[in-house]
Amino acid sequence: VALAGVLAASMMFTGCSKKEEAKSEGEIPKTIVVGTNAEFPPFEYVNDDKEIDGFDMAVMKEIGKRLDCKVKIKNMEFKSLIGAMESKNLDVIAAGMTVTDERKEAVDFTDSYYTSNQYIIVKEDSKVKKISDLDGKTIAVQEGTTGDLVASGDYDSVKDAKVKRFKKGVDAVMDLKKGGSDAVIIDANPAQEFVKANEGLRLIKDQSSKEYYAFAIQKGNKKLQKAINKELEAMKKDGTFDKLIKKYI
């Protein structure tokens, strides 16, 4: 009886250990709650049907389909996304988010799925030709983005600039158009979209080091992280990823 009790206890603790181990690996939720900021075309935006669309959304919906999970999208300010994830209100952030050491302290990231850098938007008659020409100038940015960090002097070579922060990238562009700022610093793809949609503006390209977009995952949720990485790789191999690139970017 004593031996049986020891064996039973041993099995019980082994079972608990496996459950704890599984729990520590995280989980793949039946409904994946995806946070985004739909002000970043072509990666995320509100389309003509008033739906949140874009490359990131299409990729996450395809991943959800392959994992047999529903995908629920929550639109919010970019600067609020990581806080919402830390509060366990989001499973994934899909928002053209650049991987940085600071962000890694709060969230985990999937493998990178896109490489970009920062462009400068100026008026056509502007004398600005390179990033160092913005020293001491007024720069409009979307708050919390890499453009904000560059304008603030955290990256590359902008010094002593006055930084005007906006909740939406388009608002930063409108401020430039009306003469409230000298330039906008923003990621390459949305920069091209904004200039295409607004006469009287021009681009100054490739003005920063490369940056890498990835999906953010709740810290420690290795199961979901591995699952998304696996499906991203599969999508690249079977051509689905390239089809979405051609459709949106």
Residue ranges and their predicted role:
Residues 18-24, 70, 146-164, 196-205, ...:
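Ligand-binding clefts/hinges and TM-proximal coupling segments of bilobed small-molecule sensing domains
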Residues 57-66, 132, 138, 143-145, ...:
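Extended ligand-binding regions for polar small-molecule ligands
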Residues 65, 70-133, 202, 207:
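Acidic, polar ligand-binding/catalytic clefts
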Residues 10-15:
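C-terminal motif of bacterial Sec signal peptides marking the signal peptidase cleavage site
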